[in-house]
Amino acid sequence: MKKKALIITGRLAQDHEFIYPFYRLKEENYEVFTAVKEKKIVLGYFGTKIPPQKDDKIISTDDISEKDFDLLILPGGVKAMEHIRLDKKVIECIKEFDKKNKTIGAICSATMLLISADIVKNRKVSGYYAWKDDINNAGGIFTDQP
């Protein structure tokens, strides 16, 4: 049985921060699901279709549940994160992944979502350098290491 990966993203996400993990997970034989609030293809900051093909698996963030997936990827993009972090269902899903000790990969500005989910306390967290104060103020330990 294939492992399942969930990528939560939205309009104006950083294209490369979505595309790279999307295809790497497929190369590793994961079944990849993209969760977007509107449950439709959106455009990244540079105009890339997210997800790239109309037959890629896409679900609404209203329908996500940690129990259906093995790992979670959160691509960055400040404009996307500003909206996604207000989605209570997304924040609850992140908390559930954390409670079950499942892998969460947050890229660049997606550390905002980890802060909103209140899961950075006493943990080393890397991300975009502009979020250093936010990470530290949330009780995390900012690091510039991957």
PLM regions: where:
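Active-site-adjacent pocket-lining segments in enzyme domains
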Residues: K3-I41, Q53-P146
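Acidic/histidine-rich helix-loop elements
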Residues: G44-P52
